[in-house]
């Protein structure tokens, strides 16, 4: 679950929907 949260944070940091892609 932490990986999903990290992905969401990375997506927001990059300004992209990285969490959606991942």
UniProtKB/Swiss-Prot annotation:
GO terms for molecular function: ATP binding. GO terms for cellular component: mitochondrion. The keyword Manganese does not apply. Keywords: ATP-binding, Mitochondrion, Nucleotide-binding, Stress response. It is found in: Mitochondrion. InterPro entries: Heat_shock_70_CS. Belongs to the heat shock protein 70 family. This is Heat shock 70-related protein 1, mitochondrial. The lineage of its organism: Eukaryota, Discoba, Euglenozoa, Kinetoplastea, Metakinetoplastina.
């Amino acid at each position: 679950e932490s990986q999903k949260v990290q992905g969401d944070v990375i997506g927001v940091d990059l300004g992209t929907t990285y969490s959606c892609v991942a």
